[in-house]
Amino acid sequence: MTTLKNDRFLRALLREPVDTTPIWMMRQAGRYLPEYRETRSKAGDFLSLCKNTEFACEVTLQPLRRYDLDAAILFSDILTIPDALGLGLYFETGEGPKFHKTVRTEQDVANLPKLNAKADLDYVMNAVSTIRSALGGQVPLIGFSGSPWTLATYMVEGGSSKEFRFTKQMMYAQPEVLHALLDHLADSVIDYLNAQIDAGAQAIQIFDSWGGALAHREYVEFSLNYMNKIIAGLQREKDGRRIPVIVFTKGGGQWLEPMIASGADALGLDWTTPLNTARNVVSGRVALQGNLDPAVLYGSAASIEKAVKAMLDDAYANGEKTGYVANLGHGITQWVDPAQPKIFVDTVHEYSAKYLG
């Protein structure tokens, strides 16, 4: 394998010394970039973009050409697993993802096939290996999956939801059915992420996008427990290097203590949890990642710089000099001016020298 030229992202996740704060951005390959929109137009639709190795590689690399990022993240979708399980993923303009089939009964769960990620999601593995090769050791490649709870919400609801009516109905009225579904999904995610690691992913992020919709006990029982199972089942070393794992529960800042016990190397934060507070809670036991409000990127250069510096001041307030990766608190939005993320990235690298130099 090609020697990694810039490994500060991996080192920060493992709480090893770094020369400057590493940064990447959730959804860094996306609709805010004109070159992404052009490539998507060539592909014809979003799913075709994900399933074409050449296009998926191209859009993964696009933000790295514009910004001095410290990691690339596989361009794909969190709903590849439910699609491979036969639910029939499709997208309607302005309405987000939908499925032709839902999973709402014990029989529906029993009918789900066992996932063979290398065969059933070979297009993802082809993309990972192609991107890893194209990066040439420039920066590490992040692989990812949705959490079982988050995947289950889409499968039970039949698409996006704000209230999670059917999923929560299952949770309270038929918890054994939901547990069976979540267990099946945890096994699927383990297989999927290990296949990504075999294909070349050098770090893993689990996106628990809807974990924050749960109450405390339900979060632990129906979301965190299954992420714990996944982490325990992952390869943690490849080619002589540890494969760090990041858990990101949007709206999960109040659950840092139980998340620390998950076995993850790092916890992602959204913008509702102050970094200095989180640093004090974790006390160096895990790294942290985050947590600029993506809306900050709508502002002027001066306002972006001010917000980024305040974020870094919080991150290093307790004197720790590593164990931190800068990021947004959620995905970058399609309305951001492509010039603005450069201010974010460059300010992180330049200002963090004050603490790390």
From Swiss-Prot:
Record-annotated site: Transition state stabilizer: 77
SUPFAM superfamilies found in the cross-reference section: UROD/MetE-like
Enzyme's top EC category: lyase
CDD domains according to UniProt: URO-D
Any GO BP: protoporphyrinogen IX biosynthetic process from glutamate
Similarity comment: Belongs to the uroporphyrinogen decarboxylase family.
Record protein name field: Uroporphyrinogen decarboxylase
Gene coding for it: hemE
